[in-house]
A protein has these predicted regions:
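Low-complexity, acidic Ser/Thr/Pro-rich repeat tracts that form intrinsically disordered stalk/linker regions
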Residues: 31-79
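Histidine-centered active-site loop/cap adjacent to the catalytic His
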Residues: 326-374
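Extracellular glycan-recognition/adhesion modules and their associated mucin-like linkers
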Residues: 379-409, 426-457, 473-499, 516
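Structural recognition of the beta-strand scaffold that forms the well-ordered cores
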Residues: 80-92, 126-130, 167-172, 177-179, ...
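Short, well-structured alpha-helical segments in soluble
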Residues: 142-164
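Alpha-helical cap/lid subdomain in secreted, periplasmic
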Residues: 158-328
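Serine-esterase "nucleophile elbow" of acetyl-processing enzymes
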Residues: 60-132, 189-190
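Secretory targeting and sorting signals
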Residues: 1-39
Length: 516
């Protein structure tokens, strides 16, 4: 449940099912009710007493940490980080799990390689009290413990907060509430195996209502965790309370992987249509709901919705475990045999850890994280991704730069089209200094950039989408309304007519070469 480390050490409910095994997926005294906000210095405030059962646990943990059961002043404690929530942060999918959390009576699947143990945030002790399958009711004050040997997660926080000086509380929860992401994913996988067709049309119409239903539950959970920390003697500014959003495990471009082994060997066992809906509809809507909940509750928000773009199941550098069936645990197989499927693997948790480290050090209240140039090194950006992408409207034609039919395979066409609000017309220009600097990313995928094919800089050359790689043929300069290849400054992006392909032409100062 916890890991001790040197002070300066650097360092989803199951989301899928196997059709022949699974028809569905998984599910002491409360510490306190939420108390009023306070700005008083934590050192000047005493904690409220815990109920006897929790105090006994606290005293035993203090003895293991310090050699005696006393509750110490904050400035005399070890520093700590703690994560709460569900399978997305517990370590489900990593494959290595702490004793007692890998069945048969407890399937929390906490991994020693989960993100909270791998950040570069200076801390003496790291705690992972999250549990695969958790919903907000398993986290909130007065909630329900998932297993007989588990505490409600807010009670675990109450104990840790009295024994260590908590620097960051990380919450990742919501997927197992109204959204029911696991059962939906199960259905999509089963439908693919049994040739029933895509599941997207079944869920698309009601998806936003599901998101709307989970938002107040996440908000209330954040408020409860604030109350737990106040009752433990902390002022709100003494630590960071971070709500982390969920990345998507699937994308429709997996066949661009030169080593694509096939859907069953690779584990991306859903229809192509469903991978597109997951990336372009389901995950973005979920992210917007999580962002709203975090902002309404006053938590720091980390938007990871694009973090796994280019690293989804069946890609050539995946950060997610695909469909996986453990035929040995349990035996005979059951729903628990596939619970590791479609969850972040060890590389995914390392990416989480990198983003969390950058966020902690940044001081930002809201930030987004992604891998902008397929380097495997996530980069943090201020603000939410929802605000970063903008249309490129041509001053001459009045149309917008459009990814044709929202298809993002390598070589996909980029044209003009009547302006709308679709993600196929959103673009983000990377103004940073990293490997992806000066690239133009499609809102559909952070791993698809505007590209001059083969670096052929000539008048009339049509542009397309390609894997983002940070090469010169994906770098552009914005100058006086024009967009020019960084390596060919006399050529400008041009829309000759409303629906013409986006081409390079000699810069001539015309409105057809200006974008607003």
């Amino acid at each position: 449940m916890h890991r001790t480390r040197p002070t300066f050490r650097s360092t989803v409910a199951t989301l899928a099912a196997f059709a022949t095994v699974v028809g569905g997926l998984v599910a002491l005294t409360p510490a306190a009710q939420a108390s009023a906000p306070t700005a008083a210095p934590a050192a000047a405030r005493a904690s409220t007493p815990l109920p006897p059962a929790l105090e006994e646990i606290r005293a035993a943990e203090a003895t293991r940490l310090y050699g005696d059961p006393a509750e110490r002043p904050l400035d005399q404690r070890k520093t700590g980080l703690v994560s709460l929530g569900d399978s997305q942060i517990s370590g489900e999918g990593v494959g290595t799990y702490e004793p007692g959390t890998d069945g048969p009576d407890n399937w929390c699947h906490r991994s020693p390689d989960s993100a909270i143990h791998r950040t570069g945030i200076a801390a003496d002790v790291t705690y992972n009290v999250s549990c695969s399958g958790a919903s907000t009711v398993n986290v909130r004050v007065g909630g329900t413990a998932q297993y007989a040997d588990e505490l409600v997660q807010s009670d675990s926080l109450a104990v840790k907060a009295r024994n260590t000086k908590i620097k960051m509380v990380l919450l990742v929860a919501g997927a197992n509430d109204d959204l029911q992401f696991g059962p939906v994913m199960t259905d999509c996988v089963v439908r693919w195996f049994t040739l029933q067709g895509p599941c997207a049309d079944k869920y698309r119409a009601g998806w936003q209502a599901r998101v709307d239903g989970l938002v107040p539950k996440v908000e209330s959970t954040v408020a409860d965790l604030r109350g737990v920390m106040r009752d433990a003697g902390y002022a709100d500014g003494d630590y960071k309370l971070v709500v982390m959003g969920y990345p998507g495990p699937l994308a429709p471009d997996f066949r661009d992987n030169p080593h694509f082994p096939g859907k069953i060997p690779g584990g991306c066992t859903v229809s192509d249509e469903d991978t597109a809906w997951a990336r372009d509809g389901a995950v973005p809507a979920f992210q917007s709901g999580m962002r709203k909940a975090a902002n309404n509750a006053g938590a720091v928000y980390l938007d990871n919705s694009r973090l796994f773009h280019g690293h989804e199941v069946c890609t050539d550098d995946d950060w997610v475990r695909g469909l996986y069936v453990d035929i040995t645990n349990p035996f005979p197989p059951s729903a628990n045999s596939v619970r590791q499927s479609f969850h972040p693997n060890a590389a995914g948790h390392l990416a989480f850890a990198s983003c969390l480290t950058q966020l902690y050090d940044s001081g930002l209240r809201e930030a987004s994280c992604a891998d902008p140039a397929s380097t495997g090194r996530p980069a943090l950006q201020p603000g939410g991704w929802d605000d970063a992408f903008q249309p490129l409207k041509n001053a001459g034609t009045g149309s917008c730069v459009d990814v044709s039919a929202s298809k993002t395979r390598n070589g996909s066409k980029v044209t003009g089209y009547g302006c709308g609000d679709g993600r196929n017309q959103g673009w983000w220009y990377d103004t940073g200094t990293g490997a992806g600097a000066r690239s133009l990313h499609s809102e559909l995928s952070h791993d698809r950039c505007l590209d001059v094919p083969s670096g052929t800089y000539r008048a009339g050359a049509a542009l397309s989408l390609w894997d983002c790689h940070g090469g010169e043929n994906q770098k552009f300069v914005r100058e006086a309304g024009t967009i020019r290849p960084a390596s060919a400054g006399t050529l400008c992006l041009t829309l000759a007519s409303e629906r013409d392909p986006l081409r390079l032409q000699n810069c001539d100062g015309s409105a057809n070469q200006r974008f607003v």
